[in-house]
Amino acid sequence: GLGDVYKRQLGSIAIAANSFAVTAEGLCYMPGYGIGSAATTLVGRSYGAGNYKLAKRYGNICIAMGAVLMAITGGLMMIFCPFVFSILTPDPQVRSFAAEVLRIELLAEPFFGASIVAAGALRGTGDTFVPSLLNLGSIWVIRLGLAVLLITPLGLRGMWIAMAIELCIRGLLLLYRQHTSKYYKLPAA
C-alpha cells in the first residue's frame, strides 16, 4: 500500500525523525493557537459592539504578537531541539536528522503564527469561509504538490521544505485577507 511506498522511499530513520520532529514542532505552535483564540474573542467582542476600528486593531496586535511569539519559540527550538530529541530517542542518527528537518520548518514559524492568529481574528468577524478555503487549498495544493515534487530528489528534507514554503504562503495569504477584509467595515449581523 501507500505506507509501504512511503517506507521504501524514506527509510526507517527518516520516518522516525519525521515523527519526532512533528512532536517537537507542536511545542512551537501551541502559543499561536492560544493567541488565535484570544484574537477571536477580542475581535468578536469589538466587532459585535460595532467598534470595527478596534476590532481590526485587536486583530493586528494579536497577529503581531502571534508571529513574534512563534518566532521566539521557533528560535528557542532551533537551539534546543538536539536536547529535546535526546529525551525522545537514544538513536543519534534519528536525533540528528530530526533536528535537521525541524530546523527547515522552524524558519517559517513567524508566518505560521501569523496565519493561525489571522484566521482567529477573521473568525471573530464571522469571516470563516475564505480563511478555511485558504487553509485547505494551501495544504492540499501547495504543500502536497511541492512534497510530491521534492520527495524523490530530497527525501524527507523535501517534505519539510514543502511544508515551510506552504506555511509562508499561507501566512501571507491570511495576512492579505486580514488587511483587505470587508468584514471590518460591515455592521455586525
Locations of the language-model features?
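Alpha-helical structural context
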Residues: 9-10, 87, 125, 153
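Short alpha-helical transmembrane segments in multi-pass integral membrane proteins
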Residues: 43-108, 150-189
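Small-residue-rich hydrophobic transmembrane alpha-helices
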Residues: 17-81, 112-135
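Short runs within selected transmembrane alpha-helices of multi-pass transporters and secretion channels
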Residues: 33-36, 105-124, 130-140, 146, ...
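Short, small-residue-biased leader/transition segments that mark boundaries at the very start
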Residues: 1-6
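Interfacial/gating helices of multi-pass transporter permease domains
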Residues: 7-26, 92-100, 127, 161
